[in-house]
Amino acid sequence: MAQDSNNLIWIDMEMTGLNPNTDCIIEIALVVTDAQLNTVAEAPVLVISQPDSVLNGMDKWNQSTHGKSGLIDKVKASTLSEAEAEARMLAFLAPYVPADISPMCGNSICQDRRFLARCMPQLEAYFHYRNLDVSTLKELAKRWKPEVAQGFNKQGKHEALADIYDSIEELKHYRQHLFNI
């Protein structure tokens, strides 16, 4: 497949917490869509190894959520470093989207960007500086058209790949019901 500068890169990560200065990435997924939000390619979901000291430092919410999903066990079994995960994701993206073209797409994407800037700076730099943050549309819909905001229910699995597809479907919902496109 040839690179397409209209393609969009969607990202979601699961982390050990919300502080990008002290918490760590434990799962990362990427999906490339075309401009009409059709899936072009899906990267393998990567689970990143973290030491027990990092996992034991998670708050109750993260321990419960990532424990129930099985992610903690996957992290313990993983041998993949952040650097290796970053290299694999960059290799995945290269055939589909030129560097510095696609905005970073997802929900509350600024948080992902903050973690990438510290933990995977080359991957963060692959994105354009702009963001396509679906949560912005959610906040506007809540205020301007509450019925549109209430008309979409996310699965909320807190699994990176499932959350990306939730975000894509949510953007399709707003495209149809907020923008009438």
Curated annotation (Swiss-Prot):
Functional summary from the UniProt entry: 3'-to-5' exoribonuclease specific for small oligoribonucleotides.
Report keywords, A-Z. Answer: Cytoplasm, Exonuclease, Hydrolase, Nuclease
What EC class does the entry list?
A: hydrolase
| HAMAP family listed in its UniProt record | Oligoribonuclease
The gene designation is orn
Q: Which organism is it from?
A: Nitrosomonas eutropha (strain DSM 101675 / C91 / Nm57)
The highest taxon in the source lineage is Bacteria
- The protein's predominant localisation is cytoplasm
**Protein's UniProt name:** Oligoribonuclease
Q: Its Enzyme Commission number? A: 3.1.15.-
Instruction: Say if the entry is tagged with keyword Cytoplasm.
Output: yes
Residues of the active site: Y129
